[in-house]
Amino acid sequence: MNKPARQLRIREIIQQEHVENQHDLLRLLKEKGVKVAQATLSRDCAELGIIRSKTHAGYRLLFAEEHSGRIIKGLVGMEVVSVAANETSVIVRTLPGRAHGVGSWLDQFHSPLILGTIAGDDTVLVIPDSVENISALISYIHKNLSTN
C-alpha cells in the first residue's frame, strides 16, 4: 500500500475508533489488511500531526489541531462574561482587552449566521445575517464558546 493510501486509512481509523496508542493503531491497521512497520507508523503519525492525549475516558490518539482547538475553545470561553441580544444584534461582553480575540474566534468559523463582528476593548458586536436568526445565532455563539 502506498503512503497516501496508508495515511488515509490511519486518518479514518483515528476519526472512527477510540485508539489509545500506536500499538492499538498498528493492530487495527493489520485487521484492515494494511501491513506497516512500527517505525513507518510512527513517522506517519508525526506527519499527520497525531498526538496521544489524556481524555475523560483515558488516553487517546487525536489530531493535534483537534486537541488544540478544544483548548483554545475553552480559553476563549473563559474570556466571555455574557451574551445578550435585542431585536437586531448580539452583544458579547468579555474580560477587559479580550474582545478582539473573541471576535476573531467567531470570525474564523465563517458562519452564515454571522454577517460580521466589530470588537472594542471588552465588547463584541455580532451582526446577524438576518434579524430572524437572532436566537439561532445566540445558540451558535454559546455552542462555540462552551468549554464542554
From Swiss-Prot:
An example Gene Ontology molecular-function term: DNA-binding transcription factor activity
| Keyword annotations of the record | Amino-acid biosynthesis, Arginine biosynthesis, Cytoplasm, DNA-binding, Repressor, Transcription, Transcription regulation
* Record keyword Amino-acid biosynthesis present: yes
Mention any one GO cellular component term assigned to this protein in its UniProt record. Answer: cytoplasm
A Pfam family found in this protein is Arg_repressor
**GO terms of biological process kind:** L-arginine biosynthetic process; protein complex oligomerization; regulation of arginine biosynthetic process
Localization recorded for this chain is: Cytoplasm
Q: What is its main location?
A: cytoplasm
Q: Which SUPFAM superfamilies match?
A: C-terminal domain of arginine repressor, Winged helix' DNA-binding domain
Note the InterPro entries from the entry.
Arg_repress (IPR001669), Arg_repress_C (IPR020899), Arg_repress_C_sf (IPR036251), Arg_repress_DNA-bd (IPR020900), WH-like_DNA-bd_sf (IPR036388), WH_DNA-bd_sf (IPR036390)
Q: In which pathway does it act?
A: Amino-acid biosynthesis; L-arginine biosynthesis [regulation]
Q: What does this protein do?
A: Regulates arginine biosynthesis genes.
Q: What family does this chain come from, according to its entry? A: Belongs to the ArgR family.
What protein is this chain from?
Answer: Arginine repressor
Organism of this sequence: Chlorobium phaeovibrioides (strain DSM 265 / 1930) (Prosthecochloris vibrioformis (strain DSM 265))
